[in-house]
Amino acid sequence: MSVSAHPDDSEFYAGGTLAAFAARGAEVTLVVCTDGGRGGRGLEDMAGVRHKEQQRAASAIGIARVHTLGYLDGDLAPSDELRDSLIELIRQHRPEIILGHHPATFYVRYGNRVQLGHSDHRAAGTALLNAIYPRAGSPNFSPGQGGDPWYPREVWLFDCEEPDHRVSIGEGFESKLAALAEHESQQGVAGGLTKAARRVAALYGKDDEPAEGFVRLVLR
């Protein structure tokens, strides 16, 4: 399972890794917290457009299950409501590994460039960790979210300043780029995303092999 703030976040930060999981037969679920409605210009129904783009992008990396929670883009908060929605999905899908935003990223250095962190990313990451522990895995918490308690084996945090776990994505890199290209409303943004994805994959990689970086938390 990958939990992201916006459409295209999971593909940008972890698309190659997710493509590899799917290719190995894993049941991968994407959760997108916001509607992405402020992520572009010139389209009235930007949220609806981005929802369709996200479905196509997920298909490009072999993923059929996408949950869009529909929070307002730019105003995401680590609320009890968001936390409880994530608990419900974790218990429903019972993922062994959950990917999501690092909750404390205010900026990331990529070589000589600095990318400021998005407040929605931190909110999504905080809500995810609050959902995982102590609630999702305990019968004593959140009975209203239904399902049997579930505690993932690992959490991999992307969008991080200092990754300690790098995943080679040579086989999934083209699928990642194809997925990013499906976000057509972001052209100008998406073209930049593709270029940035190549640059970041090269920075994390070794011997010309592209990679993605995470902070890896082994929970059990």
Residue positions per predicted region:
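Active-site rim/loop-helix segments in enzyme catalytic domains that contact anionic ligands
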Residues: M1-E96, V215
